[in-house]
Amino acid sequence: MQTTKNQDDLVRIFKSILKEERFGSQSEIVTALQAEGFGNINQSKVSRMLSKFGAVRTRNAKQEMVYCLPAELGVPTAGSPLKNLVLDVDHNQAMIVVRTSPGAAQLIARLLDSIGKPEGILGTIAGDDTIFICPSSIQDIADTLETIKSLFNYAE
C-alpha cells in the first residue's frame, strides 16, 4: 500500500505529465508513470485518476485525440501553464487575433482583459479557440502585439 507521500508524488507527477506531454491512451499514461518509478500503477488506477481530476480527451493542434486536464480555476497569471495554450498570434491594421487550444480562449481572454488598457488592450471577444483583441489605439497596435507575444513567450 502506498504511503501518503507516495500518493502525493503520484498525483503531482500525474498532473505534471498530462500538462507537459500528450497522451492518446491510458496505456501510454501507465507507461509514463512506470518510467517515473510507480511500478504498481495500472490502467484501472489511471482511469480512476483521470475521472477524479476531470481529464477529458480533446484534439490538440495536430488534430490528435489526447488527454488534457481542465484549466485550473482562479485568477490566471502569465506564469501559469496558460502560455502553453497559445498556438498563434497574428494581426492586421485594426485587430489582433490569438488562436488557442480548444476550450482555452475564454480563460486567456480573461487574463488579457485583466491587464487591459495600461497594456494597450481595449477589450476582447473570445470563442472556443479564437480571441479577437481590440487595441486601445490602432497607431500602437505593434506595441500591443509585442506585449501580448511577450506575455505568453510566443515566438513565430
Swiss-Prot record:
Compartments it resides in: Cytoplasm
InterPro entries, A to Z: Arg_repress, Arg_repress_C, Arg_repress_C_sf, Arg_repress_DNA-bd, WH-like_DNA-bd_sf, WH_DNA-bd_sf
Stored Gene3D superfamilies: 3.30.1360.40, Winged helix-like DNA-binding domain superfamily/Winged helix DNA-binding domain
Molecular function per GO: arginine binding; DNA binding; DNA-binding transcription factor activity
Entry annotated with the keyword Transcription regulation: yes
An example Gene Ontology CC term for this record: cytoplasm
Highest taxon of source: Bacteria
Keyword S-adenosyl-L-methionine applies: no
Record key words, sorted: Amino-acid biosynthesis, Arginine biosynthesis, Cytoplasm, DNA-binding, Repressor, Transcription, Transcription regulation
Main location: cytoplasm
Pathway: Amino-acid biosynthesis; L-arginine biosynthesis [regulation]
Gene Ontology terms: biological process: L-arginine biosynthetic process; protein complex oligomerization; regulation of arginine biosynthetic process
Family affiliation: Belongs to the ArgR family.
Protein role: Regulates arginine biosynthesis genes.
Protein name per the record: Arginine repressor
Organism: Shewanella baltica (strain OS155 / ATCC BAA-1091)
